[in-house]
């Protein structure tokens, strides 16, 4: 039955029928736990693997005793301001022992800085917030596979994959012989390897495998008869062309598999091998053993006889997660190994008397490895900070790409597909559309990572004898779960936990079966354990098609934080948890009473009388340029409990996630303005700032040292009117609060110009005024084309004040410009069910369709967008939202355990609305009734980050490409619109030859023609005939580079010479006369000119002959 439930400070009418026996875990613990493991264990493991380091004689030994972390130099916010990393120094306590004279030197050595994880599970690297994504990789272990030969007979194979070291493979050929390959080299009969390992005679080998005929056949093919021959044969195959000796072969074999420094299958590899082959080798033993090799061969022989099972590589029992801790440990180990080499060399070179640990240890390889990992690894990503949900899901992202993983091109359908072992571990819905589909996934809500890196999911234990579900929770990994029957979370139970029905629906491998209740082993803890956080935020998910649910989950992450936030009327109950764990809201550490609450700080007096201060972030710029702002939701004198939300962040309301707004929607066509998913909205949404968002852009200007002198930030800029300088302070930096438009000066800066030959007049001035007359050019920071707004903050850094700046930079000024963007035509909007569209028209409020009581609807959506897309959830949300708004309720309808149709009808009746959820609407323009009843209700709509202001673009004069001399493309390059092949056809179809000629020549890449045309426009003359486009010249040059003798001949067969851009000087003069300033560097020139072509009017044809 529906019941009221409290979510933080908000109560919702919840329709959930299932009491969840286990709380949701902290949603970013995957990041935090992994990094904590690294600091406590991973770092020590890596250090113990490399230390102690001995020199080549064995006299000197550098051992490691302990390590400690210092305090970070700056706070998190200071790091963001100063563009530095949030990190702490790592110090090692080491001991240098001289074994000859027994001398011991102990000291503490600084080992560089290690980036620290913030409370929110992120890292600050060079001032930018970054996330390290967990990687899904093939687990170390032993794998058996099966393929078909040409005749259709099964061929089996086996591979032992280590964490690091050589791969050991076994394979069959169609003759039924077993071969081995080591590290993808040439294959050798497996019996050669067995002999080399010490099983010399045929009898011993046959005995070991009970006279197996496959082995007997392989022995016939084997030419070696004893260990020595086998070793030499083995060495020849692995190192062809080198001299094979018994000792070298023995050493090679030992190094390949039995040396812990070169071969490591990690604890997880040992666990997998023991489990698959039924061995009991202790977990400390992480290299291969004889037992591993013989048991692997044994299992392969069993497979040939039809016993045992092959492995599916996409099963989550065979794929594990490498999270931040392990990734960083591997990187750190790489650095340590490089350092070890340096230490050894220094031990041999330096004098023993003067040696100290500080002299030996070179930390550069370590700091370089760590820096490289955080700065440029594929898995260390710039955090998606569009809204709190985007932050949260980015930290829970699982990627199969990256170093040691898959590549997009090689990944087939098999790897990308949903597998039954994903249940409760990886979300089957949320994944990107496009080339990464299925390679990037998201952790399911209850998923956790065990010590081996496998994802586990919780289940309730079932007492089979009684048929009763217990409240005992067991976490199972994918391979452990395979042996059990698992019932669904919504299997009917009585109040004591007994199954009501005799037969229960349960999962077993990929099948869903109906089985007697006494065969059930476990039961799901919650219906939402299958899905990720973003998917579990979609109400009525069970009524949506999976493809649209995927779009809904992905688009919630793109919702822009609005100025006025509003939590959804129809939610799923997960909004509170998602907002809390994202780190966007402020949470009270201890209980107490609010003493002071202002916009920027909350003070709470704890029960022991001391005061906790919480600083709030105000109008900060997020990574994506959205506005990050926190505001208090507690009042002075209010009692606050520990872990209670006391301030809202972006996209939250009363501690709940609030990505969009609840708006009244009608599903009807309107004059074709909602054709093809377009959206018609009311002007009310613009006027009332319903979908208004704030966007903050950062611009920076640095004054550097140049060869000709230092740049200077100043108000004194040459050739600039006083009007342009009116908002600059006396240093030449814009004041906070100024409204700026494109091309306004933000920071005045001048750069020294190169000395040129001075005229006599200039020499006289120089003599009178001294240095002052030195030429400088204006290199001020200006507002880019198409941007505008208000200056909200200015930050200044200078070397003189002791700020850390990059080399060569003396001063740095950052200016932040905020824009208030109201919703407008061309903006993209979406619901939570994958129903997205672009706003096509904003209608005056009075013209919108209205209800019988005169209320105009706010948005009109096209009903044809629903049936074919099969996302009926939006209609149910619309009905439920209307009823809930009328009754003044908030609803929680969890996924697969929420309100059904009957509940919706009941609520509509309660609210005195028609059970159909439809009503009569009137046309706002004429006042007439529409013919049919129309579905109306409240839907939660989001404004997405694809805003028209960022996409719209126009160009007049701009940069040209250097080679083709055609305008560049794209908004970022201030490019033009390409008039391509198909567009040319369109003009050809109309026969508009002059328009076409103009587009393909003077408006594009006829360099001389461009300038002449500009000249004639300036002088008011007729526009001259176009010349030959630069692209044509490039084509000729390309053909000539292929050794084709290509020339242009006129109608009377005499050659027309094409001039190159060598006559630049006088054309620059001409351009200057016209008031055009041509830059000196050719890349990105505004206008380029070359020699005009003679005889261009003549008939031109292309003739080619091979040279």
UniProtKB/Swiss-Prot annotation:
The answer to whether keyword Transferase applies is yes
Is the keyword Nucleotidyltransferase in the record?
yes
Put simply, this protein is called DNA-directed RNA polymerase subunit beta
Catalysed conversion reaction: RNA(n) + a ribonucleoside 5'-triphosphate = RNA(n+1) + diphosphate
Q: Which GO terms describe its molecular function?
A: DNA binding; DNA-directed RNA polymerase activity; ribonucleoside binding
Which segments cross the bilayer? Answer: none
**Region annotation (Disordered) ranges:** 1062-1081
For this UniProt record, give its keywords in alphabetical order, as a comma-separated list: DNA-directed RNA polymerase, Nucleotidyltransferase, Transcription, Transferase
Check the record and name the PROSITE patterns matching this protein: RNA_POL_BETA
Q: EC?
A: 2.7.7.6
Q: Which family does it belong to?
A: Belongs to the RNA polymerase beta chain family.
Listed Basic and acidic residues bias regions: 1062-1075
Record the organism: Syntrophomonas wolfei subsp. wolfei (strain DSM 2245B / Goettingen)
Q: Please explain the role this protein plays, according to its UniProt record.
A: DNA-dependent RNA polymerase catalyzes the transcription of DNA into RNA using the four ribonucleoside triphosphates as substrates.
Q: Which terms in the GO cellular component ontology are assigned?
A: DNA-directed RNA polymerase complex
Gene that encodes it:
rpoB
Which Gene3D superfamilies does the record match to this protein? 2.40.50.100, 2.40.50.150, 3.90.1100.10, DNA-directed RNA polymerase, beta subunit, external 1 domain, DNA-directed RNA polymerase, subunit 2, domain 6, RNA polymerase alpha subunit dimerisation domain, RNA polymerase Rpb2, domain 2
